[in-house]
């Protein structure tokens, strides 16, 4: 079973399942700045906001609170409001939707298309990891209290990991670059933040007693860039992908490892260069990864969406084009535009059933009751596409 969500009119850049609500919901963003909150049972958006700038990445922060990083160099915190307004979905359709409103925003460098990482420190305090203001090869770390604009402070400025990473024994055997390259991806995995670089290096970072530590470093993707990172919370590991067919598995280091050296003020713990496991996927150029229980989800630049279970192919899907595009040539004759026969997939996510959702079964109409029951009984993967559509597919 597969159904399609339609509201975006430009490339879907990111999507995140929302688990804080009683029924399954989804948050999605696009390259024109539209952000939608979807009810996956009614299959319609229930709230929206137009930021009017390319949204790079989004995160679900908490109950009714979301974060969006955009190309205008701002990270916005957005809250779901109770009041509704008439919102135009496209040229023909308008719907009554709840409001999403900006409640807090801070400046963040977007020189490249890296995402961001947020660590919840409790009591509405957060730690933000992102690219440095002036140098996309370096990292800044900020701490702030949500809603207090005076609390925003940079705790680490322009962190460049090259000297610390290049000093590892594993790096000396393999690493031949004179720099790490730009930061491509961030992801939070418990108390560790993993960073993927243009050079193919994946580094795990922690903050201990106000000191920055390198607790993990992998060179498996070198010299190809890291394209995606995904956190497997069940098995305490992180997956990474690149332009090759290799997906690397990085085990999250145990806490409180002994520090063996310090380079340029950055601590390096024992065995930071531990070897990683490598999975050979049946295709290359894996742009996005996600984990759903024991299933690894991925999308490829070749148009395929793939599911792997125990390193075996569980499913494969490609959304084919069904219409020909026609361009006018310079001599006035219509010419068929040559395009790829498929629509490029982008971000992917997985959703498994939640027993909490059964609390609202009695409040739904018969049709909604049936759809929710079916949704809870299966696993689903959700894919955003370059044409603005989002497919929700049953596994």
UniProtKB/Swiss-Prot annotation:
<feature type="repeat" description="WD 1">
    <location>
        <begin position="7"/>
        <end position="48"/>
    </location>
</feature>
<keyword id="KW-0677">Repeat</keyword>
<dbReference type="InterPro" id="IPR036322">
    <property type="entry name" value="WD40_repeat_dom_sf"/>
</dbReference>
<comment type="subunit">
    <text>Component of the ASTRA chromatin remodeling machinery complex.</text>
</comment>
<protein>
    <recommendedName>
        <fullName>ASTRA-associated protein 1</fullName>
    </recommendedName>
</protein>
<feature type="repeat" description="WD 2">
    <location>
        <begin position="221"/>
        <end position="260"/>
    </location>
</feature>
<keyword id="KW-0853">WD repeat</keyword>
<feature type="repeat" description="WD 3">
    <location>
        <begin position="343"/>
        <end position="386"/>
    </location>
</feature>
<dbReference type="GO" id="GO:0005634">
    <property type="term" value="C:nucleus"/>
</dbReference>
<keyword id="KW-0156">Chromatin regulator</keyword>
<dbReference type="InterPro" id="IPR015943">
    <property type="entry name" value="WD40/YVTN_repeat-like_dom_sf"/>
</dbReference>
<comment type="function">
    <text>Component of the ASTRA complex involved in chromatin remodeling.</text>
</comment>
<dbReference type="GO" id="GO:0006325">
    <property type="term" value="P:chromatin organization"/>
</dbReference>
<keyword id="KW-0539">Nucleus</keyword>
<comment type="similarity">
    <text>Belongs to the WD repeat ASA1 family.</text>
</comment>
């Amino acid at each position: 079973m597969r159904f399609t969500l339609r509201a975006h009119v430009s490339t879907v850049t990111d999507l995140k399942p929302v688990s804080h609500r009683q029924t399954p919901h989804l948050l999605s963003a696009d390259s024109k700045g539209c952000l939608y909150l979807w009810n996956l049972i009614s299959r319609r958006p229930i709230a929206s906001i137009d930021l009017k700038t390319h949204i790079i990445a989004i995160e679900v922060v908490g109950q009714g609170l979301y974060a969006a990083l955009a190309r205008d160099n701002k990270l916005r915190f957005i809250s779901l409001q109770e009041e509704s307004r008439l919102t135009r979905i496209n040229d023909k359709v308008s719907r009554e939707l709840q409001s999403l409103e900006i409640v807090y925003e801070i400046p963040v460098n977007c020189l490249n298309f890296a995402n961001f990482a947020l660590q919840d420190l409790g009591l509405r305090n957060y730690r933000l990891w992102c690219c440095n203001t002036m140098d996309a090869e370096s990292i800044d770390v900020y701490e702030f209290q949500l809603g207090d604009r005076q609390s925003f402070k940079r705790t680490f400025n322009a962190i460049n990991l090259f000297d610390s990473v290049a000093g590892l024994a594993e790096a000396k055997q393999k690493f031949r670059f004179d720099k790490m390259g730009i930061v491509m991806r961030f992801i939070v995995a418990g108390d560790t933040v993993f960073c993927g670089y243009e050079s193919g290096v994946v580094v795990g970072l922690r903050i201990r007693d106000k000191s920055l530590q390198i607790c993990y470093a992998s060179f498996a993707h070198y010299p190809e860039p890291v394209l995606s990172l995904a956190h497997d919370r069940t098995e305490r590991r992180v997956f990474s992908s690149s332009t090759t067919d290799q997906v690397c598995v990085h085990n999250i280091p145990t806490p409180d490892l002994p520090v063996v050296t310090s380079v340029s003020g950055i601590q390096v713990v024992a065995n930071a260069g531990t070897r990683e496991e490598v999975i050979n996927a049946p295709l290359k150029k894996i742009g996005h990864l996600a984990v759903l229980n024991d299933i690894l989800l991925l999308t490829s630049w070749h148009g395929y969406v793939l599911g792997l279970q125990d390193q075996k192919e569980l499913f494969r899907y490609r959304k084919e084009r069904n219409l020909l595009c026609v361009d006018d040539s310079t001599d006035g004759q219509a010419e068929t535009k040559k395009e790829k026969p498929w629509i490029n997939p982008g971000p992917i996510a997985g959703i498994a059933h939640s027993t909490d959702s059964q609390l609202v079964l009695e409040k739904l109409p018969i049709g909604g009751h049936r759809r929710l029951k079916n949704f809870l009984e299966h696993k689903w993967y959700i894919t955003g596409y370059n044409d603005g559509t989002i497919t929700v597919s049953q596994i």
